[in-house]
Amino acid sequence: DWFKRLTRRSFSHSHNVSVSGGTNKFSYSASMGYNNSEGQEIGNDNERMTGRIALMLRPIEKLTISMTLNGSVSTTNGFFDDINPMGYATNTNRIIDPDAYYMQENGYYYKTGNKETLSYNFINERDNSGSKARSNFMSASLDVNWHVLDWLTYQFTGGYSTNNSTNESWATEHTYHIANLYRGYDFNSVTPTSADFKAAQLPFGGRLYTNDNNQYSYNIQNKLQFSKAFNPNNRLNALLGMELRSSTAKGTANTVWGYVPDRGERIVAPTIPSQVVSPGGSPTGWGILKELYDRSWKRTNNTNNFLSFFATFAYSFKNRYVVNANVRNDASNVFGQDINHRIDPTYSFGFSWRASEEAFFQKHLKWITTLNFRGTFGIQGNALTRESPELILSQNGVQAGYNRYYSTISQIPNPYLSWERTKNWNFGVDLELFHMFYMNLE
């Protein structure tokens, strides 16, 4: 029963503790949590710890300051790229002994001429490979709410967050994966003087892939809110604001060969290319070193900055007629050099008429309990972060045959890059009859 050998009953448990207290002038709350989850597949589990602290200060009647700090740490254990316990349990014949090794194709024979098959056992493959992901997250925020006047409020919101993750996956020298790609024979099955040993790129050690990512972001927002009723029939609401936000993502990915985790996590050097000789006597080329210098190492560094100004306006007369308007302008480091798009705001307008509140309806059409007409028109946009206002040149290594550094153009420039524009019209009617039947038309 492959499911019995490769899977289990999933089980998870969570624990949380929290404290809180305070007065009208000061309050606090703190919490901690722990979660452990064992997945359905043996070898797949997750552990997570979280924490949160929140403080509220009210030094004067009209001023409120709130601060929050969040954090979490998690670790996830999983499988190597080509290890799928559930798929193997579903598709594999039950006659096969789970502890036995059976023959698989030798993918390395084209370099050695040796077509002998390789030994394969799924449980051995699972136990001698794996993956692990670690993540650390922390965020802090500050909110200030100040009622300057009865009809005027100032709000400040600021936040900063960081998320660091480390991912690694590995396959040791005891796996079929390494034998099939880099060795051509089962581990420890040949002598150092044999032709197969001399033709192996990686006679000792396995492969380790690591990927480290660091993300940072901050957000600052200032808003002024205006809300005033001039008399029972007239009310005005308005808001002015600015927002500054930025996000940066940095990452480094790397692959090394010769990884031996059971000997102090050492790296054993692969065979020198000039010493890797096929049975025919000709070198096989750079071998693993070619992979090392050909896209196996990668670093990314990407930053997006945005500065925004926005305003909203809403006017209500007799609580029946409402008009509103919104305008927003954004600047970004991903835009081009076209001066016509440096100030290119988005905007929207809307209206609403509560017809059922009119005297005519109240007197002659009482069975129409609700009748609203509304409409909006607006332009919205998204930043095309995948495009670039500048020429992107990929500076590569040395071009074979020319023995010169070479570069390739990966993206042509778009100097007219700006927000994409989407126009929206919306009209709607809300109707209710006898306080029983309701209809909405958009």
Regions inferred by a protein language model and the residue ranges of each:
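Residues on the lipid-exposed face of transmembrane beta-strands in outer-membrane beta-barrel proteins
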Residues: 17-21, 53-57, 140-146, 220-228, ...
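One face of beta-strands
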Residues: 32, 158, 347-351
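Residues embedded in well-ordered regular secondary structure
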Residues: 1-43, 80-82, 125-128, 145-147, ...
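A short alpha/beta connector and helix-capping loop motif
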Residues: 343-351, 435-440
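Surface-exposed loop/interface segments of Gram-negative outer-membrane beta-barrel transport/assembly proteins
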Residues: 1, 39-44, 50-139, 155-157, ...
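Long hydrophobic segments that form regular secondary structure
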Residues: 145-150, 420-442
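Transmembrane beta-strand segments that form the barrel wall of outer-membrane beta-barrel proteins
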Residues: 32-38, 323-335, 375-377
